[in-house]
Amino acid sequence: MFKDISIKDFDPVLAKAMAAESVRQENHIELIASENYCSQAVMEAQGTDLTNKYAEGYPGKRYYGGCEHVDVVEQLAIDRAKELFGAEYVNVQPHSGSQANSAVFLALLEANDTVLGMSLDAGGHLTHGAHINFSGLNYNAVQYGLVEGTGLIDYDQVESLAKEHKPKMIIAGFSAYSQVVDWARFREIADEVGAYLLVDMAHVAGLIAGGVYPSPVPFADVVTTTTHKTLRGPRSGMILARDEKLAKKLNSAVFPGNQGGPLMHVIAAKAICFKEALENNFKTYQQQVVKNAQAMAKVIQERGYEIISGGTENHLMLISLVKQEMTGKEADKWLGDAHITVNKNAVPNDPKSPFVTSGIRIGTPAITTRGFNEAQAGALAGWICDVLDSRGDEAATAEVRSKVEAICKELPVYAKNQ
């Protein structure tokens, strides 16, 4: 029925845009902390005929026939995730990290219940209670922040707010925090007020799987994550728990509460991702991610730029540009012109709008996948500072761009593109 025809032949306009993106990924340095390069095997799984299969329900209990093979696929993903993170319960069906969080809210809370989460400008996420998100619109969201001067999580404030507001759920986790989180302290505070503890480990899931960042699974009631970022899998989500007492509620919240049919081709890609993460070389990769981040942070600080919290113990750093009287939007543009991709990001007490900001966030998962070592990461940090110091000067930008071009050729992402 279907002709054996390529995208290029059938839809050349789309093919051109896709090819251009492949070129961009090969020729630009990727420093967005939430991005990474997945393996060809992960991409292959997402292009299979599993995409045709509807499979509402869970393995062994589907609402459609013909699910005997996709049951095997999903169970493989579940079992591997359990082994990887030491969890008793895993749901691999959420389409994203945000939908995983949404399902947890649906499972554990009633409308207008109080939740306590990290504010966006302190490094939290939209789904941790931001007023423009479902978590802030449908629930009474209280926000905690950082200790002024150190940039570390203000655990005393978390405890004080918890005692004052008696939240039904406390959220730990972040999208732009570069230090180690004290999961045990969050557990103590949650127990003190009788709250559920949800940990969103999306950014550090790979580091945790690799044993270079402490796991929240023994402490949290529920853990959510994406499967890309440091985990280096497909763009998707997952829910885990230390025991199965909440399994029925969580499963029902994902399906039918929050989603219909799962994406079986993506779940297959998750199974591959988890198998890759169980390999010995994955730990070596995660160790290098942190080493590269620390090498970059050292140079950036030596060049006079402030890193919120004073450094990094994970894969990312949030750089304040307030002292330089520079906006994140400007820095994003100037570095982009040099073929270095970052994202503008709010900093604590940011006077600028979220679309402008006073900071940038950078991370090392993608460059480490590419093969960068500490020396190359440190050199890259210097190039970033050269561009920012020049405020986007054309000559300085061109010089850095030529260096970027050279190292991208030296360290290709995918050999097939060379």
UniProtKB/Swiss-Prot annotation:
GO terms for molecular function: glycine hydroxymethyltransferase activity; pyridoxal phosphate binding. It holds the Pfam family SHMT. The keyword Transferase applies. The record marks 228 as: Plays an important role in substrate specificity. SUPFAM superfamilies: PLP-dependent transferases. It catalyses: (6R)-5,10-methylene-5,6,7,8-tetrahydrofolate + glycine + H2O = (6S)-5,6,7,8-tetrahydrofolate + L-serine. The keyword Amino-acid biosynthesis applies. Keywords: Amino-acid biosynthesis, Cytoplasm, One-carbon metabolism, Pyridoxal phosphate, Transferase. It is found in: Cytoplasm. The modification N6-(pyridoxal phosphate)lysine is found at residue 229. It comes from the Bacteria. Its cofactor is pyridoxal 5'-phosphate. One of its GO terms (biological process) is tetrahydrofolate interconversion. InterPro entries: PyrdxlP-dep_Trfase, PyrdxlP-dep_Trfase_major, PyrdxlP-dep_Trfase_small, Ser_HO-MeTrfase, Ser_HO-MeTrfase-like, Ser_HO-MeTrfase_PLP_BS, SHMT-like_dom. Homodimer. This is Serine hydroxymethyltransferase. It comes from Psychrobacter arcticus (strain DSM 17307 / VKM B-2377 / 273-4). The gene is glyA.
